[in-house]
């Protein structure tokens, strides 16, 4: 069975490797163009391209698929049975969705229809959801509105960051899409069910500004945001005129004026919130490395009563 693969980041690269390891023929891999990255802004290949080249697969990196006759012709010439799409980052027009014999399967990191859109992992944590998961979806022209082929649940742990949930769902998604491809190969079809009309929510793209901590919010809300925005865009506060990223914190039963430092020791930096307080245990000063609070407190003095 011929499988075109389309994806860009690590989440997708894991799925590509799993599909290849399962023995499916992959005549073409689509990924986004190389982009400048890092402090040196060096042109860097996306993880899917790196994985594809290691596997000896053909790679194409079109800037867009919409109104791109050359890319469409390339896809048609492959005569693929199905396309697997995972965090590709480009819009697939209807003519692309229709090109493979069995259409396009998307690996989506939420329990649809909850958290359609760009940042489902982060929004699930931010909202305090007890669970999330992966859906393999038959793509249509809408935003994550296609019929669901399979659903795989994951319990969000109280200390899970977006990075940790991402890594768990990455493995779940890779295994899930392989299982569905194997079913398609053996039965010639997939049983997909329509998404419920109720329970639809949208996971809007993250912004740096929304990650700025508002101490007037409750400690529970802020703690969830810290985990949801870890590693990027990273929850932050202004400290000595510069942004300081907050990486880990826990809720403590203390009270004070919102934004007031209640204590600072090797055990944690305690800051009052609109309700209860947060004990910050790991942070990252502007231009510096991540550090635990003991290392931070050893070189700096933040007095009780100071404002963050």
From Swiss-Prot:
The enzyme's E.C. designation: 2.1.2.9
Alphabetized GO MF terms: methionyl-tRNA formyltransferase activity
Gene Ontology cellular component terms for the protein in this record: cytosol
Recorded family membership: Belongs to the Fmt family.
HAMAP family in alphabetical order: Formyl_trans
Function noted in UniProt: Attaches a formyl group to the free amino group of methionyl-tRNA(fMet). The formyl group appears to play a dual role in the initiator identity of N-formylmethionyl-tRNA by promoting its recognition by IF2 and preventing the misappropriation of this tRNA by the elongation apparatus.
Record's keyword terms, sorted: Protein biosynthesis, Transferase
Protein biosynthesis among keywords: yes
InterPro entries registered for this protein in UniProt: Fmt (IPR005794), Formyl_trans_C (IPR005793), Formyl_transf_N (IPR002376), Formyl_transf_N_sf (IPR036477), Formyl_transferase-like_C_sf (IPR011034), GART_AS (IPR001555), Met-tRNA-FMT_C (IPR044135), Met-tRNA-FMT_N (IPR041711)
Catalytic activity: L-methionyl-tRNA(fMet) + (6R)-10-formyltetrahydrofolate = N-formyl-L-methionyl-tRNA(fMet) + (6S)-5,6,7,8-tetrahydrofolate + H(+)
Uppermost EC category: transferase
Signal sequence range: none
The species this protein was found in: Neisseria gonorrhoeae (strain ATCC 700825 / FA 1090)
Protein name, as recorded: Methionyl-tRNA formyltransferase
Binding site for (6S)-5,6,7,8-tetrahydrofolate: 110-113
Gene name linked to the record: fmt
Keyword Coiled coil attributed: no
């Amino acid at each position: 069975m011929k499988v075109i693969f389309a994806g860009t980041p690590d989440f997708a690269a894991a799925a590509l490797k799993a599909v290849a390891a399962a023995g499916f023929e992959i005549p073409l891999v689509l990924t986004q163009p190389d982009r400048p990255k890092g402090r040196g802004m060096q042109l860097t290949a996306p993880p899917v391209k790196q994985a594809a080249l290691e596997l000896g697969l053909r790679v194409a990196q079109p800037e867009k698929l919409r109104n791109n006759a050359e890319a469409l012709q390339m896809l048609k010439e492959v005569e693929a049975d199905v396309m697997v799409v995972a965090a590709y980052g480009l819009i697939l027009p209807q003519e692309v969705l229709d090109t493979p014999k069995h259409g396009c399967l998307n690996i989506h990191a939420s329990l649809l229809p909850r958290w359609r859109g760009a940042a489902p992992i982060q929004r699930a944590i931010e909202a305090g959801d007890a669970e999330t998961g992966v859906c393999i979806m038959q793509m249509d022209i809408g935003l994550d509105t296609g019929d669901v082929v399979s659903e795989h649940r994951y319990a969000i742990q109280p200390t899970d960051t977006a990075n940790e949930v991402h890594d768990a769902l990455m493995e779940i998604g890779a295994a899930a899409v392989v299982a569905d491809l194997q079913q398609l190969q053996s039965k010639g079809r997939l049983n997909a069910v329509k998404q419920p009309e109720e329970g639809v929510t949208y996971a809007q793209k993250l912004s740096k500004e929304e990650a700025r901590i508002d101490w007037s919010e409750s400690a529970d809300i802020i703690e969830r945001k810290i985990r949801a925005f870890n590693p990027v865009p990273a929850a932050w506060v202004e400290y000595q005129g510069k942004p300081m990223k907050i990486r880990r914190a826990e809720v403590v039963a203390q009270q004070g004026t919102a934004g007031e430092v209640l204590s600072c020791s090797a055990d944690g930096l305690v800051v009052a919130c609109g309700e209860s307080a947060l004990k910050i245990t790991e942070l990252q000063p502007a231009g510096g490395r991540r550090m635990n609070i003991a290392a931070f407190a050893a070189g700096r003095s933040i007095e009780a009563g100071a404002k963050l």
